Amino acid sequence: GMLFVMYNTDLTAENAKAIKIHIPLTSGAVSGYFDLEETRTIAVYTELIQKATYEYFIIKGKEMLLNFHRIKLLQWQPNSIVEYITMFDHFVNWQYDLLGLEDIRPTLFNNHVNGSSVNDDSYMWAGNGQIGFGINALDEFMPTEKLYIERRCWGPAHEIGHLHQGAIAWTGCFESSNNLFSNYVLYKVGRECSNGAPLSELADRKLNNRPFGNFLGNPKTEDMELHMRMYWQLWLYFHRCGIKSDFYPELFKKLRNNRNLNNLPVGERQMLFVKYASDIAQKNLADFFDTWGFMTPIDE
């Protein structure tokens, strides 16, 4: 197996500093890993992965740590790993831009996002502060060009978005609110339009006075395609149209500053989202959210 040493400290403390750890090894072999910030070259990567003997090989970027099956890296990434891990770093940083973390990262935390592949038939998932992929799912997005031209960046960006959706992860919205982040990644990549249902479905929803979501917590009943469109419409208006280019960063800061937010009933959290969004926009957005069903009572 692989040995990982976690070093946690208060980065604001005067004595917080990098330390060196020596671990005497009585057996086994050093498999090595690729560090973008230290090695940077394809030649070094090729040498390291060819000499590695373990089932997994680690690629360390500036923001992302990929712990993938070595056989898949040899198959799909024999000589373009620098561009590949750089793209994953972009996925993370672009989502950080929406979250407005400049005041707390890296001053308060500097950990990487971890992504691992596993030996099972699973697809893609997120949990416990990391993202994961079934070994066969890697085939969908490991060739670098697929991240650009075949919309395959959506899957990894969607899972990374799960790590960042906490303030808007309302019951009935778990698989949709994170797509604010994956739609932003699509926009930044610049090859595809956004995902989500057309606004004609919103008109039908409004006509039938349907609520925005339900509180059953069942992803199968979640209106994911329409939900993600609402978050993106706000981005299009405030960011793309230049009305208020810091709308989402300031909104997420305000949500984070409410330390009691996740202890509130989900309905109250949604109403606070309406209030905070209006505060940040300096506009009364009640009509907008009413159109999307926020004000429609839920009896589920």
Regions found by a protein language model. Give the residues of each.
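A generic structural signal for solvent-exposed, polar alpha-helical segments
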Residues: 40, 131, 295-298
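Catalytic cores of extracellular degradative/oxidative enzymes
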Residues: 45-240, 245-251
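Generic hydrophobic, helix-prone segments enriched in Leu/Val/Ile
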Residues: 21-23, 88, 231, 274
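Extended acidic/polar, glycine-enriched regions
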Residues: 1-53, 58
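Pan-zinc metallopeptidase signature
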Residues: 236-300
